[in-house]
Design a protein with these regions (language model features):
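Charge-rich cytosolic interhelical loops and cytosolic tails of multi-pass membrane proteins
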Residues: 1-4, 107-174, 243-250
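Hydrophobic alpha-helical membrane segments
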Residues: 82-91, 171-191
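Hydrophobic alpha-helical transmembrane segments in multi-pass integral membrane proteins
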Residues: 88-98, 151-160, 186-190
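Inner-leaflet juxtamembrane helices
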Residues: 67-72, 127-136, 223-237
Length: 251
């Protein structure tokens, strides 16, 4: 397996990404502002998205300034989990919609709890796959290169790490899609009378986007965030304690 240790490190782009993400989040906030005018999401949601993105962009800029030289992987790992904030806000549309529609409280709580249970289950299974793979020394050596002084993350191993688990909610599979979307369908079914009693257009859009967004939430939280937390935060800290060497990003 040929791997280039000198390809661009994500930290080198955090300054520009901080600005780009602010633009993307502004567009997301604009979409939620429009939805809020139709009463399908909370009126304050778009403001919260913008405020949270300002915080995320500030953290990214501080990280770029403070960690560009040390290049500590576990620090970059934490920041990298914040970087997908705009996409997480899109993926959580189903949650924001469920919180806003006037369905019975018991049904609302039950459906949201069921959805988060599915997310937690998927994340746990992916984490179990990663923990099992990390027990194999050759896997760890493939991901982290020992240059004698430090352990260096091989940037080109993203696809290799993804291949350590076959669990991907975005893969086509009728049974899995039906299973994942059943809780949402129950809540949306309970909202039928409300939907057809008002302007149907915004609700139809939110329902369609919610059904698409839930598998996206599963993928972001259950795959991406678990991967980042395990291979860029937990495992680097564990390796630093075990070897006495810093785990860093390549220059």
């Amino acid at each position: 397996m040929t791997i280039d240790l000198d390809d661009a490190s994500p930290i080198d782009f955090h300054g520009k990404l901080a600005v780009l993400e602010l633009v993307v989040s502004s567009l997301v906030a604009g979409g939620y502002f429009v939805f809020s005018q139709f009463g399908v999401v909370a009126a304050s949601l778009w403001k919260l998205v913008l405020a949270a993105q300002l915080f995320v962009s500030t953290v990214m800029i501080l990280h770029y300034v403070m960690n560009r030289r040390p290049r500590r992987l576990w620090v970059e790992g934490i920041v990298s989990m914040l970087m997908l904030f705009p996409f997480l806000m899109i993926a959580l549309l189903w949650l924001f919609y469920l919180l806003s529609i006037p369905i019975p409280l018991v049904l609302k709580v039950s459906v949201i709890a069921a959805c988060f249970a599915l997310i937690a289950r998927h994340a746990f299974l992916v984490l179990s796959d990663f923990r099992r793979a990390a027990k194999i020394e050759s896997v760890v050596q493939t991901i982290y290169h020992d240059n004698g002084k430090n352990l260096v993350l091989r940037h080109s191993c993203g696809g290799y790490i993804d291949g350590l688990t076959a669990r991907n909610p975005l893969k086509p599979g009728v049974l899995s899609v039906v299973a994942y979307l059943t809780p949402l369908a129950a809540a949306l079914g309970g909202n039928v009378n409300h939907v057809f009693g008002e302007n149907i257009g915004p609700h139809v859009l939110c329902i369609a986007f919610s059904l698409l967004a839930f598998p996206m939430t599963l993928s972001l939280v259950g795959n991406f965030y678990v991967r980042q937390l395990f291979f860029r935060v937990y495992l680097p800290l564990k390796l630093e304690r075990r070897t006495g060497k810093r785990v860093i990003l390549a220059q």
